[in-house]
A protein has these predicted regions:
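Conserved acidic
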Residues: 1-354
Length: 354
């Protein structure tokens, strides 16, 4: 069911006529499993797809205080001053990571009731399979590589020596970076499951099938269906952490009211991007100067984004590959790098108001 005249949450209104609209609805339906047709909104359709793959019923889970209180601060925006070798570059390029969050729908999520554990021990290469929240401090003045996104930003914003982090974020700190973490307590699920993975595969397969025929015009049936597919899975992640309304029992009974899924997916995507940026820096000597959600900025002497991309990053439409978003003169925003106004400065430049 598509109410195109009223639908402002998906791309149906971009169809130039009824023929293209019908073709787009049909294309999306054919790219998805049976009984997963579009219905009413991206959120409602995504919920139906997830439920379709959980034929035995979606696993229920009790949300611990850090999830309910939205205690986790995500590293979503960062920039740094230029290094000497970057200051002489002419151009600043932005690439977006394709399907960054969809690629993490296989993350382990809790089932049932979490346990409150005091002074838990993180076991390298093992604890990463335990979904949960950890109250963590960093000992000994440790600092991450200053050429990469600032992983200590959440501590500074909180103004506290201890903050709550998810398992994927702690895995990045403890296993990948060997940070000297100290854990005061945790809420951990003894049982966990990658229960979003099957639905993620359906969205991924639809994305690949539709993307293979979309030409980027934004008005044909394939482009419209592809954008609707993306709307579904991106909104589904945010919808897990939607504001709770009504009584607590009603919210708790909704199997897709899952703040933990939102937190774990976002942090898993961040960790994957961080590891990739670290590998790129070591392999090529080129380091990001900024990130904004799933987008990353690099400097270059080359004006063409397809040629300027670091050698270890792959342009393409697949999950985890990169799409070039924009290129601007570096000197237009260089003075804002390292400050809070950088991303606004970029958008003002692109709008022609700077």
């Amino acid at each position: 069911m598509v109410l195109a005249g009223y639908e402002n949450r998906a791309a149906w209104q971009d169809a130039p006529d009824g023929r293209v609209l019908l073709a787009a609805v049909t294309a999306l339906a054919e790219a998805m499993p049976p009984a997963c047709n579009y219905y009413y909104s991206p959120n409602a359709t995504a919920a139906a797809v997830i439920s379709h793959h959980a034929r035995g019923g979606l696993p229920a889970a009790t949300m611990p205080p850090p999830a309910l209180e939205r205690a986790v601060t995500h590293v979503a925006s960062w920039s740094r001053p230029l290094m000497d070798e970057e200051a002489g570059c002419d151009w600043l390029h932005r690439w977006d990571t394709n399907g960054a969050q969809l690629a993490t729908w296989g993350v382990k999520l809790g089932i049932g009731d979490p346990e409150h554990v005091m002074s838990p021990r993180w076991v390298p290469k093992k604890s990463k399979y335990t979904a949960g929240y950890w109250l963590v401090s960093i000992e000994g003045g440790w600092r991450p590589d200053m050429r990469l996104p600032d992983l200590l930003g959440p501590w500074r914003r909180a103004g506290e020596p201890q903050i709550w982090v998810t398992t994927p974020f702690l895995e990045l700190l403890a296993d990948d970076l060997a940070a000297p973490v100290s854990i005061a307590e945790a809420w951990l699920w003894p049982q966990s499951s990658a229960w979003l993975e099957a639905a993620g595969h359906s969205f991924r397969d639809a994305r690949a099938a539709l993307g293979a025929r979309a030409d980027g015009c934004g008005r044909c049936e394939w482009c419209i269906a592809l954008r609707v597919d993306k709307d579904r899975y991106t909104r589904a992640t945010g919808n897990c952490a939607r504001r709770r309304t009504g009584d607590a029992a009603t919210a708790a009974a909704d199997p897709l009211q899952r703040e933990d899924a939102n937190d774990h997916i976002i942090d898993k995507a961040l960790a994957i991007d961080y590891r990739r940026q670290l590998r790129t820096g070591k392999a090529t000597g080129r380091w990001p100067v900024a990130i904004f959600n799933d987008a990353v900025y690099y400097t270059s002497d080359l004006p063409d984004g397809n040629q300027a991309i670091p050698a270890s990053m792959t342009l393409g439409t697949g999950l985890g590959q990169y799409s070039h978003e924009t290129t601007i003169p570096l000197d237009a925003v260089a003075g804002e790098l390292g400050g809070r106004g950088f991303h606004r400065a970029v958008e003002r430049y692109l709008r022609g108001t700077r």
